[in-house]
Structure formats: structure tokens, C-alpha cells
Amino acid sequence: WSDQFPHIKATGDISGDCSYEKISKKNYKGKTLKINTHAVPVIGQPTALHAEQFAKLTGATVDVTHTPAGDLYAKAMVPFKAGQAPYDIVFGFSNFINDWRQYLAPVPKKYLNTVEMKDVTKSHVGVSSWDGTMYQYPVDGDRHYLKYRKDVIDNPEMQKKYKADTGKELKVPTTWKEYGEMAKYFNGWDWDGDGEKEYGSAEVMKKDDLMFAAFFSRSVAYAKNPSTPGGFFFDLETMKPNVNNPGFVEALTDWVEATKYVPPGGINFGLGDEIGSFGGGQTLFSFSWDDAFIAAMQDDSPIKNKVGTAPLPGADKVWNRVSGKWDNKYNQAPYIVWGWAVGVAKKSKVQEMAFDYLCFFSNGANHQADLAIGNFGVNPFKNSDFDPKLYTETMGWD
């Protein structure tokens, strides 16, 4: 099938219940599937690509609408509440599940039992489900972590220069304060010799474009205290939002300072901008989803195999919401950040076709190909995604 669909040239078709071979036997001629998804490229581009492939294989007509991140919730919820279903498939964020689930068709048993679904990690089955019922079809997995330039951080000459100029060690930062200090130092000069200025950090700072997730990743070090389980977003007794407590304020103070070490225009970076900036070699650091790291490891990236990863930085103090004081101890809280989610409208008249499309979207061949493209926004969520051979042999990473 790779001769007809070059997207899967690295693997060809991969055996499964929703493989190219299996889906090609479906006949949806005369039927139309309507999808609302995110704007291109992130998740919107693979949605459109797999829609085109699905149409070619099955004879279906597939209409894809692209919507900005900030409007995805309302684009589905407004017609849902009016008893309408203008889209058979709606993409959004997995934290929409409680509001959307009454309007979504539960994933049928035959799809729960597919080879593809049985490969999904337990955590992402949980993210897609409510009270044991799966309402959102797993197509993506999320986690935030640190990305950095190994050719700088691990460079003995750079380490020597940084030590001489600052009196501090150049190493992978373990606190947000260290992250900021290093990012400032490496901001605004050509430190990799490519003839262009580089900058400290690429971050998602644009309003209504996933900046909330970036802020939470900065906040957890200061506000997620292991001594006070739960209650990160709200007080467990009063449901008063915690966002104004000193932990969140400290993170916001750091983030305001970060506006001084991002590239020109960086305070308006959306996710796609962050991916292109770090992936294209413009910055020393980045943190968010896998996408920027994947972009940096693509064959067309000037920094392929020059990047490293580490858990999110921590902090030397963490707010204790119970005592109302700072606990002066090191705290690091890796953050799993929901994921792109998608469901089938309960009032859709083509539910089987819709679920076939979603199963095809995430089949083995498509998923492995999608993982290798940074701005597609598809990240690991299957057990097989954590086999190193997928990246070293199939994708050619060091």
C-alpha cells in the first residue's frame, strides 16, 4: 500500500483490524463523513491527510473543517446543546470529556477489542474514559518535558565559557531558576556558528493557543506539593481556585521574566511556532509536548541528533496550601497534560463509518508515520511506542 500512500513508506501497511488492507474492503460510496478538527498543522494536518486516505480506500466523501484551539469546545458544544450534530466527529481536548460525554456515542465493543486498541496504554485508556466507559477515541498521548541542545549544554568549551562568565555550572537545568539563568545567557547571539542569532527558549505563550498547559508545567514545581495530595487546581474543601496562591504566582513571575529570553515575536508563539522554533535550531531550550523534539530529529532539521531531553525542571521550594507556608525542599513534578481527544456524535447517522475512520487514523502504519512528523502533534500513547527500535531503526535517530 505504500506505493499508493507514500505517508507510510517507512513501514508499509501494518497488520491490524483497521489496516489499509482491512479498511479498503469497506464500501462507503454515497456516504458523507463530517469532521471538525484543529487548525493546521497540529492535529489538523493528520486529520485531513487520513481523511483523504480513508476516502480513497472506501469511496466515502469526507468533509474536514479546521477550527482554532480556543473555539473547539464551543464549535461542538453549542450545537450539542441545541440537539444538533453538524459534525459526525469532533476533535478537542481530553479534559472536555465530562461536558461532552452525554452527547458522544460510547466506543463500541468491537473497536475496544481491536488489535490497535489493545496496544493503548492503561493511562490513555483512562484519559479517554469516564466511569469505565470510553467516550473519546485514543489518537494521541501527552506529556511535557524539557528539550535542550546537547551541542551546547554538553559542550566542554561552552561549559568553560559559562563558568568563567557566571561562576556557575552549565548543565541540564533541574530548577526553573537555572533554566532562566541559562536561557538569558544564551539569548540573542550566534552560539552555534550558523551565522544567525539564537535565543534562550521557545514556549507556547499565545493566548487561547494552549498557553494554559505551558503555564501549568511551570507551576507544578512550585504548587504541586507531594505532602498535600490532590487539590492542585482547586481547594478540596471549598473548591476555591488555587491559581492565585504563592506557588502559582512564583511560576508566573518566572514566566514574565521568560518573555525576555524568547525569540522575536515569541510572546505570541502558538504550539506550531514553538515546534518550528526549537525544531529549526533557533533556541537553547523548549518544553511542552514531544512535537518540538520530533521536529528537531527530522531529516530536514539542522540539529538532528543534537538535542536531548530531561524531566521538567523543579524548584527549591514548594507551596504548602495546608500550612499556608513555603516548604523549603526540592520539588519536581512531571506533568502529563491530557491530550488531543476525539469523539463521535451520538446523533451521527454514520457512526460505524466514523469509528472506522478513527480506528484507521490510529492504525499501526499511520501512527508510526505520524509520530515521525513534529508538527502533526501526534505523540506516543501505545505500549509499542516505547520500544526504542521504533525510533532508532524506523526513524533513524541516534
Predicted regions and their residues:
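Immediate post-signal peptide segment of exported/extracytoplasmic ligand-binding proteins
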Residues: 1-34, 55-56, 187-197, 353
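Extracytoplasmic "Venus flytrap"/periplasmic binding protein-like
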Residues: 49-123, 129-136, 155-157, 161, ...
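Periplasmic solute-binding protein
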Residues: 95-105, 124-168, 180, 203-236, ...
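Hinge/lid segment of periplasmic solute-binding proteins
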Residues: 1-27, 93-147, 214, 308-312, ...
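Extracytoplasmic/periplasmic substrate-recognition and gating elements
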Residues: 132, 260, 300-385
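Short, polar/charged alpha-helical segment
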Residues: 17-24, 41-61, 147, 151
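Glycine-centered hinge/linker elements that transmit conformational signals in sensory
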Residues: 178-184, 214, 222-268, 311-317
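Short helix-initiation/N-cap motifs at beta->coil->alpha
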Residues: 66-75, 174-178, 266-280
